[in-house]
């Protein structure tokens, strides 16, 4: 075939997270039976980046590498490009093209708005004036990645009637969920919707569920509602379709900026190669 696709998931210590990504890839393949879609993971899997690149390279002379990742932090900017560079050396006759990550987009915003609607429906008195919203991201040492969470939260505020839409992170950076909830309670919110900004399940989703239960006990006067991670939403498939189709002709302007970037080497020399 003309090209093959390598879908790169993050990987999770929780086996179900990787199972969901495999199932997602099978559904995407069903949408496009003429494509060859392979899956690998950055970590916590038997099939990691090098094995994924080698497998895809055996199937065609053009491989489109698609990161199934919301925010461009260390894995997207550093780790995948590093392994991609090595794959090009191992397979000099194969053209590898690195697609853009998902990022903040109108499609992702649509998913987040639906999640908010569903969480509001679980609240006894769904009044946006008294219901705070917290968009809960993974957290990164990369300010641009954290900024994407802030951007999507701002977009959500722009398109809803909620007076208070905050961001929080499960790790690496701040504010954390508990601090964001404390702030909203002090500002008079009697109901709080927490929206995980995650694609699939994993250990962090499990941690969020425990934090949610703890918050309910700490603030019995507040009605909390927890949204689901994004999962198998049609907008995710549509975004990946766009990533592939814009690269079929290998147009430079649609490639991931970090592929071949000389600043990546500088960052590696300063010890910033593997960070979320």
Protein language model annotation of sequence segments:
Residues 1-276:
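Active-site-proximal alpha-helix that buttresses catalytic centers in soluble enzyme cores
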């Amino acid at each position: 075939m003309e090209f093959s696709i390598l879908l790169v998931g993050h990987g999770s210590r929780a086996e179900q997270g990787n199972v969901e990504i495999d199932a997602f890839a099978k559904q995407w393949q069903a949408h496009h039976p003429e494509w060859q879609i392979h899956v690998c993971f950055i970590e916590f899997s038997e099939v990691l980046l090098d094995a994924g690149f080698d497998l895809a390279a055996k199937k065609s002379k053009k491989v489109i590498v698609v990161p199934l990742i919301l925010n461009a932090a260390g894995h997207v900017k550093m780790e995948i490009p590093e392994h991609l560079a090595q794959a090009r050396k191992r397979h000099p006759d194969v053209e590898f093209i690195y697609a853009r990550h998902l990022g903040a987009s109108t499609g992702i915003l649509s998913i987040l708005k639906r999640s908010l609607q569903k969480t509001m429906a679980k609240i006894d008195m769904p009044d946006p004036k008294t219901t705070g919203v917290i968009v809960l991201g993974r957290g990164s040492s990369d300010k641009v990645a954290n900024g994407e969470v802030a951007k999507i939260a701002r977009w959500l505020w722009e398109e809803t009637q909620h007076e208070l839409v905050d961001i929080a992170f499960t790790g690496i950076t701040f504010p954390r969920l508990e601090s964001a909830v404390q702030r909203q309670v002090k500002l008079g919110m009697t109901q709080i919707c927490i929206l995980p900004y995650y694609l699939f399940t994993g250990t962090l989703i499990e941690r969020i569920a425990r934090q949610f239960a703890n918050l309910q006990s700490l603030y019995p006067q507040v009605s909390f509602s927890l949204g689901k991670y994004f999962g198998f939403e049609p907008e995710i498939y549509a975004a990946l379709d766009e990533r592939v189709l814009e690269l079929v002709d290998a147009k430079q302007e649609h490639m991931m900026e970090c592929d071949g970037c000389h600043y990546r080497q500088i960052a590696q020399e300063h010890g910033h190669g593997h960070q979320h």
